C-alpha cells in the first residue's frame, strides 16, 4: 500500500481545522494541524510534510512569514495558501514567496481536492 501524503493545516479558525481535517482524512491523507504561524513553523521543523495548507492572517506569525520559512528551510514542501482574504495582492504575494497555489475561503471541497492532487503531483 502506498504511503499517505502528509498535509499540515495551519489556520487560526478551530472549526475550519476540524472540518478540513475530517474531509482530508476521508480523502486518504494523513493530517496534522496548527492553530497559528508559530505552531506551524514548529510542526514543519519537527515532522516531514508533503504539503502545507496555510492561512495568511493569523496571530503571532502570519502566513507569509511561515511561507518564507518553509521555502527557505524546507523547499521540498509544497504550500497552498488558503485564505478568506482572497484578493489579487495576496495572490501575487503568495506566488512571490513561493506558494504553489492560492485558494479562497470558503472553499469548494472538490476544487480544493483537485488543487491538492495537482500540486502534489507536480
Indicate where each model-derived feature is located.
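Short, conserved "switch-loop" micro-motifs in signal-transduction and mechanochemical regulators
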Residues: 85-86, 97
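C-terminal output helix
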Residues: 107-117
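Acidic catalytic/metal-coordinating carboxylates
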Residues: 36-39, 62-65
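Two-component/phosphorelay signaling modules centered on CheY-like receiver
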Residues: 14-32
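Short, glycine/charged-rich "phosphate-handling" switch motifs in NTP-dependent
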Residues: 100
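Active-site beta3 strand of CheY-like receiver
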Residues: 47-53
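Receiver (REC) domain active-site loop signature in two-component systems and cognate sites
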Residues: 58
Amino acid at each position: 500500500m502506498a504511503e499517505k501524503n502528509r498535509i499540515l493545516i495551519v489556520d487560526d479558525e478551530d472549526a475550519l481545522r476540524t472540518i478540513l481535517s475530517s474531509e482530508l482524512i476521508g480523502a486518504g491523507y494523513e493530517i496534522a494541524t496548527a492553530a497559528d504561524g508559530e505552531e506551524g513553523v514548529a510542526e514543519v521543523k519537527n515532522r516531514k510534510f508533503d504539503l502545507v495548507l496555510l492561512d495568511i492572517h493569523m496571530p503571532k506569525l502570519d502566513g507569509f512569514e511561515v511561507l518564507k520559512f518553509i521555502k527557505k528551510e524546507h523547499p521540498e514542501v509544497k504550500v497552498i495558501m488558503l485564505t478568506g482574504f482572497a484578493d489579487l495582492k495576496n495572490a501575487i504575494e503568495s506566488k512571490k514567496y513561493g506558494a504553489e497555489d492560492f485558494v479562497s475561503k470558503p472553499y469548494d471541497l472538490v476544487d480544493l481536492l483537485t488543487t491538492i492532487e495537482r500540486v502534489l503531483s507536480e
